[in-house]
Amino acid sequence: MSEFSDYYVVYQRVGEHAMVLVGHKNDTPRALTANQFQENTNRWFYFENGFRDEDTSQGIHHQLCNLHMSGRKMMVKRELYLALRHIEIAGAQWLRAVIINDDDTYHDDYHYLNFYENPVDEDYAYYDFVDFDKSEYKAKKYADYLPPLYTFKKVVLSPEKLAAVPLEKRLIWDDLQFTDCLVVHKSVKEIMEKYQPLDCRFTRIEEYQEDMGTRAEYDADGNLIC
């Protein structure tokens, strides 16, 4: 298998650990989704379960773990952060984060990976699309600062485009304009797996489908993939 196929999309697993993490209402992080926060990073950023009331009313209590995904937002505990912080990530920065659990317990040993600018432009993406038509993009924007998300059925990596960039500069990347996916190299995936990332799944980028992470997934025998 080609060295250029060793990439995985990281996304949220559907299950008991899954939380929709949002910035606390009295703090700044809601603006982080604009990918523009580049100020002093020595402060703390607070996040909480966006569906806390609904979950607790149904008796759902979330267990915090070493890695949490909420959409393409990734938060990792300090031990995993220390294992990843040496990696050069274009257009991104690590911010110190606090997750407020549903029982109002503050967990201040997390770091949030904030992409403050799009590291991949339209003319220099690392992949091509199959069954992709720019005229079919979703016209509705979620907010003024979010670009339209294009519809795709399959992503195919481009060995030529990848070869033009040293491996150490493309171990972790996120295309904010087209697929809106967090992508990691196999070597990074192996580091993450050592820390039992219960809240996320890894799927080879060429097997990734647009709605993964928003629905339950089943194996060939019809069993729920947990």
Give names to the regions the model predicted.
Residues 2-59:
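N-terminal ordered "arm"
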Residues 28-36, 53-56, 72-77, 140-146, ...:
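A broad, low-specificity signal for short, low-complexity segments enriched in glycine/proline
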Residues 34-53, 86-106, 226:
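Short N-terminal signal/transit or membrane-insertion segments
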Residues 44-47, 61-64, 152-156:
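Short acidic/polar alpha-helix capping motifs at helix-coil junctions
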Residues 64-74, 173-180:
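Extended, non-catalytic structural segments that build the interaction scaffolds
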Residues 67-124:
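Aromatic- and glycine-enriched beta-alpha-beta binding-site module
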